[in-house]
């Protein structure tokens, strides 16, 4: 659904800047929470993430643009799939900032070497706004033909690429 909405915003409404919907009413938040329940399974690569973090090969931080009202939902998901312990820190968008601006702020503050993101609009923003962090994009089926230097079909591929780069630089 993201592609048709983006086309309507750009070509019919003339909106060219990146902006995301922020649910405010109880109904909107309920529907938003329901939509995020669709993330029922972890990404392909979750086991590799568990292995790499438990062996201290990488230090992982979860930076999610999910809003504060989804915090319980997020922790239930992470606990259900034994992923919570993988992360040194978990940061939610508790101030309901625009997701791309929120992630830019957190990346600048934390000074990450690498950042993985699955939303093209956020990747496009971060890749020009944050130059000290290598932004990796985990693309979806609709966006697979976009050209981007560090794009991956799955979390697993992104992690493997980062590990190769870490070994080359050490």
Question: Which residues make up each language-model segment?
Answer:
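Structural recognition of alpha->loop->beta junctions
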Residues: 80-93, 148-168
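Helix N-cap/beta->alpha junction signal
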Residues: 66-67, 119
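Acidic, Mg2+-coordinating phosphoryl-transfer loop and its flanking beta/alpha structural elements
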Residues: 109-156
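Substrate-recognition "cap/lid" segment bordering the active-site pocket of phosphatases
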Residues: 68-114
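Active-site neighborhood of HAD-like aspartate-dependent phosphohydrolases
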Residues: 1-36
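A short acidic, amphipathic alpha-helical/loop segment
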Residues: 47-48, 77, 105-106, 122-129
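Short, acidic loop-to-helix structural element flanking the phosphoryl-transfer center
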Residues: 20-21, 29-61, 68-75
